[in-house]
């Protein structure tokens, strides 16, 4: 494992511990992102889906998990994964409930496009991850860029998972 050797490492460690914490801000933003993204998927509106991605807070515990793995910080990794699990499960549940309540007979292209990932989707995820890392390392980069980048890859597909479960489409 890597050993933190400076005050900067301690600052990063404290920051990542905060980022990994399951708190009210994470829950409210996750629920908001889930509702906006799911409603956008149901309305077949890419603009609304993007709106949901902008508020998703999942980059914070993901970044903390990566930091924990690099330093061998098991406690931080556990906290990060628990926070992410709550985000994924709450998003899946909310999407499932919205899909069940609306009772749409079929889904539009926004949902269907996320049921058959391809290499282009992988490329988008890799570029988004690279931009998220760049934004974290450069304090002058737009801070919302990191959250949006990771949300591109995660929030809408998790919403689609809940919607497909509501239609019993495995």
Q: What is the role of each PLM region?
A:
Residues 95-110:
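Transmembrane alpha-helix boundary signature
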Residues 69-71, 109, 158-170:
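Transmembrane helix-loop junctions at the membrane interface of multipass transporters and ion channels
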Residues 15-25, 112-118, 144-149:
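Short, amphipathic, aromatic/basic-enriched membrane-interface segments that mark the entry/exit
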Residues 78-89, 144-153:
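Cytoplasmic-side transmembrane-helix entry/capping segments in multi-pass membrane proteins
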Residues 62-78, 82, 130-142:
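C-terminal ends of transmembrane helices
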Residues 34-39, 65, 96, 130-134, ...:
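Alpha-helical transmembrane segments of multipass membrane proteins
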Residues 46-59, 113-125:
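Structural signature of hydrophobic alpha-helical transmembrane segments
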Residues 1-8, 12:
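Single conserved hydrophobic/aromatic residue that forms the stacking wall/gate
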